[in-house]
Amino acid sequence: DRLNLALGLNASEDHFNSVAWNEEGASVGDAMNYYSPLCPVTNSDGSWYKDLTISQNYNPLSMINEDKMNNQHHRLMFTTKAEFKIMTGLTWTANYSYSNSQNIYNYSNSVNSQTDVRNGAASRSIYQGHKQVFETFGNFLKTFNKVHTLSLMGGYSWEEEHSGDGFGAKVFNFYNDQVGYNNLAYANFIKSVDG
């Protein structure tokens, strides 16, 4: 009766597949607004139509079929609470929580992509972080003469957060579209590695 314990565990994993949502008009949403319905979708040979006289005039169907994005988010959270009644009116409480997250971002542009004309492009990056919080406090409550109440509280709190730890690579110039972002080593050119 004097000790109360509580534990909690929450885990989630999300997968998100989408088309590219790039900046400066190079997203499917933008292209659906500005691409003229009078322009053909494909050329007579089956390739995607592109009007070379207008800059940043991307064919939205080409973008849907040639530019891919896949993201994954993993999250884990653990919480615990202990409350101890030392005596009437005096309790001591301790809380601890830990959360961990990992985000994986992948995208690829095929060799036929209109948004990236470097014979295919791919990128993979992963970022992770964690956070810990510990707090402990005591409460004292005393009523005098059924009229006056004295309430005191004292405690300590500590927090640690580490985020943005990760790396990524961007590559270009593939022989074909078979590997996409799954094996960046097959590209002929590495633009950057971030860490």
Predicted features and spans:
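Surface-exposed loop/interface segments of Gram-negative outer-membrane beta-barrel transport/assembly proteins
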Residues: D1-M77, T93-G195
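A conserved hydrophobic secondary-structure block that centers on an alpha-helix together
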Residues: K85-A94
